[in-house]
């Protein structure tokens, strides 16, 4: 089942070129189905790129999903047209009374700043707290995972001596969890970050469950509240060329950057990337939507406020 998207969202035409079926809200309204309502708090600089990456994965589910995009109030995007933000994004004030089956909070390029020094930290904390009474299950990605773990559980982040950059092998620690249905014992995920969270801090907190980690990239997936929250440090949603674009961007800016590990064929940046995370990325988002959103959310969406932890 395709996603229900606002008409003229750029991702629609981009994904049609990849033969991915999406429909606009007018056509979707003719189907007598209660769609899943998912909101994306998009903190990434390249909004349209991130929208497309997420829509690509969410559209692979047999479930109909209606997607909203949220932005931080008063925060102007420097890399996305103002007209796009006005047409497709809502401030938190406009949706704070709404309920959602799922929420995705993206990363943000602020990881080397103390959480309390991020200009929108207070609003973000409010959104995090709101999600616990208004959302069935939330995915926190990359910096958002660090921010969520810090806000709810006091988990610190640590600076890395150099950027963690590349595609790394990960292991499944609890293969019986529904989030891992269909996963191989080892799988690959892109990472692009300057900071990390550490295993020893996670395991000290009884409310947290470490689900997956990497020998090279460290903690990857942490779960809380039985699956009502997932904290994911990598970027399984990345398109094939995202790390390449980041690499050449930093090269052109004269910034120190290593070749992304396990990414370019023969480690040659003039050759195309070797994509080996696409299958597990699709499984991750499909499993989340099916087992932790669709199967747990109430039919009357306002009953989300009465949900407890997922057993």
What are these regions (language model features)?
Residues 1-74, 89, 95, 99, ...:
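Amide-donor transfer/coupling interface in amidating biosynthetic enzymes
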Residues 105-174:
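Cysteine-nucleophile active-site neighborhood
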Residues 73-86:
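N-terminal beta-loop-helix "entrance" segment that forms/cooperates
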Residues 102:
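Short, Asp-centered acidic motifs that coordinate Mg2+ and/or phosphate
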């Amino acid at each position: 089942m395709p996603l229900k998207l606002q008409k003229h969202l750029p991702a629609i035409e981009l994904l049609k070129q990849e033969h991915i079926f999406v429909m606009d809200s007018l056509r979707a309204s003719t189907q007598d189905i209660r769609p899943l309502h998912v909101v994306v708090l998009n903190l990434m600089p390249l909004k349209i790129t991130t929208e497309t990456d997420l829509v690509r994965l969410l559209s692979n589910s047999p479930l109909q999903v209606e997607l909203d995009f949220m932005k931080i109030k008063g925060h102007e995007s420097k890399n996305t047209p103002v007209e796009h933000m006005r047409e497709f994004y809502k401030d938190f004030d406009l949706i704070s009374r709404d309920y959602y089956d799922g929420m995705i909070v993206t990363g943000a390029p602020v990881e080397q700043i103390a959480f309390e020094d991020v200009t929108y930290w207070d609003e973000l904390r409010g959104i995090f707290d709101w999600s616990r009474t208004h959302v069935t299950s939330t995915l926190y990605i990359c910096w958002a995972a660090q921010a969520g773990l810090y806000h709810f559980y006091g988990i610190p982040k640590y600076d890395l001596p150099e950027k963690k950059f590349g595609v790394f092998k990960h292991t499944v620690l609890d293969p019986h969890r529904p989030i891992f249905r269909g996963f191989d014992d080892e799988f690959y995920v892109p990472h692009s970050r300057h900071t990390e969270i550490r295993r020893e801090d996670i395991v000290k907190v009884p409310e947290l469950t470490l689900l997956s980690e990497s020998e090279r990239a460290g903690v990857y997936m942490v779960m809380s509240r039985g699956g009502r929250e997932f904290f994911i440090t990598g970027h399984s949603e990345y398109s094939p060329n995202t790390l390449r674009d980041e690499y050449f961007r930093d090269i052109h800016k004269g910034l120190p950057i290593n070749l992304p590990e396990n990414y370019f064929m023969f480690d040659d940046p003039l050759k195309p990337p070797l994509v080996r995370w696409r299958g597990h990325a699709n499984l991750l988002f499909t499993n989340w939507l099916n087992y932790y959103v669709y199967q747990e959310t109430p039919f009357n969406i306002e009953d989300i406020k009465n949900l407890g932890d997922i057993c």
